Amino acid sequence: MFNLFQKKSDNSPRQIAIGDVHGHYDGLCQLVDFCQIVPEDRLYFLGDVIDRGPKSAEVVKWIRERNYPCLMGNHEVMLLTSFNNGDLDEMALRHWLPSGGDATLESYGDEGISQDEIDWFTSLPSYLDLGDVFLVHAGVDPFRSLDQQNNDQFCWIREKFLSNHFPYFTDKTIVTGHTITFTLPGVRPGELAQGPGWIDIESV
């Protein structure tokens, strides 16, 4: 199951980043209950809130009703590519559906994904800079400035980011999901992974 990263400073609300929910609405509710979330807490979702799990529609509804910030993940990118300007892209669908998109479509039932929801997915930011914490779904290209990057890097990058030996920022920590932590050397299932200037919380 997905994990979280939380930061608490004196006399300030908790900042809680939640990793790839992937349609697991019941697990999300359990995590929120376990953390004893209060209205003052600031929750941030790192993308990939849809696909694979059986309740993507419920996850999206829950996040939207509470107006929590949510980042673009590679699975949201696949959804949007499949719904290309309102028209279904058959080639993109053949890639998205086996990657968990079939479960997302099923969760929306006969009504399907509305244009309002497509607009919401489209509006998701690629990253959030919270000062000393930088939230992004997959990572950053260590050899490019932020303004030289797009969702190809922010939502999909893996080895190039994780294998870099130097922190991208000197004054903030990058928090990501996307890469399952126990696929990295020396990390056991359920553990977070850390590297130079980054923390990966996708500890399935």
Identify what each model region corresponds to:
Residues 85-87, 139-156:
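Short, surface-exposed, charged loop/turn segments at secondary-structure junctions
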Residues 20, 48, 63, 73-74, ...:
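Divalent metal-coordination and catalytic microenvironments
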Residues 118-148:
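Active-site-adjacent alpha/beta core region of enzyme catalytic domains
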Residues 1-60:
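N-terminal active-site segment of His-dependent metallophosphoesterases
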Residues 22-26, 51-54, 77-80, 128, ...:
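Active-site environment of divalent metal-dependent phosphoester hydrolases
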Residues 2-11, 36, 60-63, 126-129, ...:
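A short acidic-Thr-Gly-centered motif at the start of a beta-strand
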Residues 56-129, 156-157, 161-164:
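Active-site neighborhood of divalent metal-dependent phosphoester bond hydrolases
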Residues 151-204:
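Conserved beta-sheet core of the metallophosphoesterase superfamily
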